[in-house]
Swiss-Prot record:
Pfam families: HDAC4_Gln (PF12203). Signal peptide: none annotated. This is Histone deacetylase 9-B. Keywords: Chromatin regulator, Hydrolase, Nucleus, Repressor, Transcription, Transcription regulation. Residues 189-254, 270-314, 409-447, 496-567 are annotated as: Disordered.
Length: 582
């Protein structure tokens, strides 16, 4: 904006306007006379015109200012309106975005709710399908028996079994005529409930029923306590027939055939007809338990089981069943401490030979039954497998055992070891039944079972002879080392211990000769210690803490005294060897 307030005074020297009607006067006189008055008028006119011009300028200036102000106000209003419109647009956009986000969230929630509803609907359908299946199964199989019904059925079975026992007059044993019906609770495998080591369990003392008993006499209605009992029994039977034991390999001879079943039935009929007044048979449960634990058995663990001939029939009508009640396993320790008289395997074999039964039936039974049910192999079968070289050794062992037994009886001392099976077989008369020997009580539990056959005894004899040879070589080596140490000492101190060394050499030679003539009968591991020298030679061998007896065969008294003397002499030698080495 230009500032128009500054006023400019203009005084023109030449008159701007002249009257057009007046003629031009060229006279100088007249001009000079009238110039003063005209100049003043003209100046006044000029001043007035200037004032008018100034006023006009001011008016124009004000008009311009007012127009500018109006335009400025209009522009400001337009700008504010534009700004407000822009803000409104932004707000609307923000609102639109928020609405879109909310719509998206709502859509997601709706989708999730729909998925949940679908899953819920699927679950409900599955539950309905399962319920329908259960209802159809229940309708097909029938009602499931309750626990009270099972308990009443068990009580009835127990009462019936006790009645059968009391009628026969034998409260502790179950006769052949007693019949027991098993419910679904008794259909458990022998592996799940194995008998304890101390004796046979209650389930092993009950004879399993035969399929004939089901057909002849069945006092109760055949109810099913579980819906899938038939399927389970079939599956258990298949598993029992096809399963292989981890302890022993399955053999083809263990599988039951119809011919073997007929032989077993024939043996039962002959045994019951030949000895009607004999005592009750031993339980078959122990046989089945032993067979199932010690190896694979062909007995299915179901209600329809075949009857095996009990071991009491094989051993004899009056033989005890203490060996049957004892649970034995080759992988478990043999605990016989505090155990009463038990039959040895050879006496069982003798009882089997004395039993007057058809040879064909007995051979069929022996071929059909597994080795775990028949117990150890009889002596007659074992001797066929032994070669001719072993027979001479068996005769020698038998003669030695008889001599030892006669010496013990003549001296009147109680035998330390029980009589061997060979001596019992020779001394027992054929008319009378052989008495069962007693087990020697063990001081501690052995990790391996006792030898139960002649082959095991032969193996132990060979091991003992090898041990004696190694011990003799060791003694010779000790003697050589002792002689070397003595020679070294003599070189170091030739004058001091000359006489003592000569005497000791003479004694050592005599003792070595005596030792070669009569070696100790039992293998002894000697621990040389300096404390043994202070003791007198009258102390027996067992009292020394440095002597550990591994095994000793009882021989003559002279042999024992010589062994004691040689052991003490070897202890003295050991002390001298240690001194020489130091």
């Amino acid at each position: 904006m230009h500032n128009v307030n500054n006023s400019v005074d203009i005084k023109p020297e030449v008159p701007l306007a002249l009257d057009p009607g007046s003629p031009l006067d060229l006279r100088t006189d007249i001009r000079m006379q009238g110039s003063a008055s005209e100049v003043t008028v003209w100046e006044r006119q000029l001043q007035q015109e200037l004032l008018l011009i100034q006023k006009q300028q001011q008016i124009q200036k004000q008009l311009l200012i007012t127009e500018f102000q109006k335009q400025h106000e209009n522009l400001v209003r337009q700008h504010q309106a534009q700004i407000q419109e822009h803000l409104k647009l932004q707000q609307e956009l923000h609102v639109m975005k928020q609405q879109q986000e909310q719509l998206e969230k709502e859509r997601k929630l709706e989708l999730q709710s729909q998925e949940r509803e679908l899953e819920r609907h699927r679950r409900e359908q599955q539950v309905l399908v399962l319920r329908n299946r259960e209802r159809t199964r229940e309708s097909l199989t029938g009602a499931v028996a309750s626990n009270e019904v099972k308990q009443k059925l068990q009580e009835f079975l127990l009462s019936k079994s006790t009645k059968d026992i009391t009628l026969n007059g034998i409260p502790q044993k179950i006769t052949q005529s007693s019949k027991l019906w098993y419910t679904a609770s008794h259909h458990t495998s022998l592996e799940q409930s194995s008998p304890p080591l101390g004796g046979a369990s209650s389930s092993c003392k009950i004879s399993l029923p035969s399929p004939q008993d089901y057909r002849d006499d069945f006092p109760l209605r055949k109810t099913v306590s579980e819906p899938n009992l038939k399927v389970r029994s079939r599956l258990k039977q298949k598993v029992a027939e096809r399963r292989s034991s981890p302890l022993l390999r399955r053999k083809e001879g263990n599988i039951m055939t119809p011919f073997k079943k007929r032989a077993l039935e024939l043996l039962e009929s002959t045994a019951s007809s030949s000895a009607p007044g004999s005592g009750p048979s031993s339980p078959n449960g122990a046989c089945s338990a032993l067979g199932a634990e010690n190896g694979p058995s062909s007995l299915p663990v179901t209600t329809r089981t075949e009857r095996w001939p009990s071991q009491s029939r094989l051993l004899g009508p009056e033989s005890s069943v203490s060996m049957l009640n004892l649970y034995t396993s080759p992988s478990l320790p043999n605990i016989s401490l505090g155990f009463s008289a038990a039959s040895s395997p050879i006496s069982a074999a003798l009882g089997l030979q004395e039993k007057h039964v058809d040879n064909g039936a007995v051979s069929a039974v022996i071929q059909g039954l597994p080795t775990q049910l028949l117990g150890p192999v009889p002596l007659s079968v074992m001797e066929t497998k032994v070669s001719s070289s072993h027979q001479a050794l068996l005769q020698h062992l038998l003669q030695k055992e008889q001599l030892r037994h006669q010496k013990i009886l003549s001296s009147g001392q109680s035998p330390v070891h029980p009589p061997s099976p060979l001596a019992m077989m020779e001394n027992s008369p054929s008319s009378t039944r052989p008495k069962l020997p007693r087990h020697r009580p063990l001081n501690r539990t052995q990790s391996a079972p006792l030898p139960q056959s002649t082959l095991a005894q032969l193996v132990i004899q060979q091991q003992h002879q090898n041990f004696l040879e190694k011990q003799k070589q060791y003694q010779q080596q000790v003697h050589i080392n002792k002689m070397l140490s003595k020679s070294i000492e003599q070189l170091r101190q030739p004058n001091v211990h000359l006489q003592e060394s000569e005497e000791e050499e003479g004694e050592d030679c005599q003792e070595h000769a005596m030792q070669e003539e009569s070696s100790p009968s039992g293998g002894v591991i000697r621990k040389h210690s300096p404390q043994n020298t202070s003791r007198s030679p009258t102390i027996p061998l067992d009292s020394h803490p440095g002597v550990i007896r591994v095994k000793e065969e009882p021989g003559a008294s002279d042999d024992e005294t010589m062994a004691n003397q040689s052991s003490y002499i070897h202890q003295v030698k050991g002390r001298m060897v240690i001194q020489a080495m130091i």
